[in-house]
């Protein structure tokens, strides 16, 4: 009888131990991750690559960094080239890093470019989601407010941070993301990209005030400005971005401006046609009325073309 009681107690103790281990195994390590952006390097609009200087902090009451190395982390969308200023405490680990990262760019609004400068940190095997879970450490996350944190030609917006889960055939993992949105300067884009193009088109539009007797000179002006507009479009407006299979906003604006050249050329040809048909009846009054119509119709057609390309 005593032997049976001892066996029963031993079995119960084994079950208790197994349950304890099961509970311990089911309790993942909670680790707070913080990223503070110190500086932003070059942004390559063609490849979507960008260089970042930042601090990474790892905080966990469940992890002793003095007794074991920090969990291995993977920078999903780039690589770290240099790590310095490592600081280790019992439940705190921090280092400074410099790395190059990549993110997809949508060029549909070019040259009003927008890019999310993101850093994605993911745990790796054996630290699946049931072993390690990231949390956002707001205390050590952000971007320095000093004036040297800037990118020429870009405006830096407020960063944001979040944690998500990534599922793969080999397991589910925790991922921490830091995102710094940047946008092209609106004023700079208008002055550098669109004002020159509009000025070139204005030369073509000005031919409506040149008398029809100078039609050869008008054609020369139109030809020269059209070549200049095409050259500007291809070599400057489309510079710095890859060849894409859709129209950018710059392409749509240029298509509407090409309408001005087309209407101006049609105006010259109509004057030639009327001059040939009416001969002595082709008066200054007829010429002036035709020019007035084209001065009104040309901007209307240009706006219609722009709206069509934007909407469709």
Q: What do the predicted segments below correspond to?
A:
Residues 5-15:
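Bacterial N-terminal signal peptides
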Residues 16, 20-22:
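Boundary at the C-terminal end of the N-terminal hydrophobic targeting segment
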Residues 22-181:
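Soluble non-transmembrane domains of integral membrane proteins
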Residues 177-301:
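Channel- or pocket-lining gating/hinge segments that regulate access to a cavity or pore
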Residues 307-312:
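Juxtamembrane boundary at the C-terminal end of a transmembrane helix
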């Amino acid at each position: 009888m005593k032997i049976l009681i001892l066996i029963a107690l031993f079995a119960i103790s084994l079950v208790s131990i197994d349950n304890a281990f099961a509970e311990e195994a089911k309790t993942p390590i909670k680790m707070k991750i913080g990223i503070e952006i110190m500086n932003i390097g070059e942004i390559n609009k063609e490849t979507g690559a960008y260089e970042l200087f930042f601090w990474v902090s790892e905080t966990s009451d469940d992890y002793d960094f003095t007794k074991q190395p920090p969990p291995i982390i993977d920078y999903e969308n780039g690589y770290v080239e240099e790590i310095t200023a490592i600081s280790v405490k019992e439940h705190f680990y921090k280092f400074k890093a410099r790395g190059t990262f990549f993110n997809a760019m949508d060029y549909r609004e070019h040259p009003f470019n927008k890019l999310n400068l993101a850093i994605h940190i993911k745990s790796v095997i054996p630290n699946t989601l049931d072993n390690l879970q990231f949390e956002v450490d707001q205390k050590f996350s952000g971007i320095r407010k000093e004036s040297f944190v800037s990118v020429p030609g870009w405006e830096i917006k407020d960063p944001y941070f979040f944690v998500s889960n990534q599922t793969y055939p080999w397991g589910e993992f925790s991922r921490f993301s830091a995102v710094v949105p940047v946008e092209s300067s609106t004023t700079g884009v208008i002055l550098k990209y669109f004002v020159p193009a509009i000025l070139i088109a204005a030369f073509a539009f000005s031919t409506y005030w040149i008398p029809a007797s100078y039609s050869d000179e008008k054609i020369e002006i139109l030809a020269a400005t059209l070549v200049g507009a095409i050259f500007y479009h291809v070599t400057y407006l489309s510079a710095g971005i890859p060849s894409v299979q859709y129209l950018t906003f710059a392409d749509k604006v240029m298509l509407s401006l090409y309408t001005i050249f087309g209407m101006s050329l049609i105006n010259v040809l109509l004057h030639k046609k009327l001059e040939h048909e009416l001969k002595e009846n082709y008066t200054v009054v007829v010429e002036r009325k035709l020019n007035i119509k084209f001065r009104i119709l040309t901007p209307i057609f240009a706006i219609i073309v722009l709206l069509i390309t934007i909407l469709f």
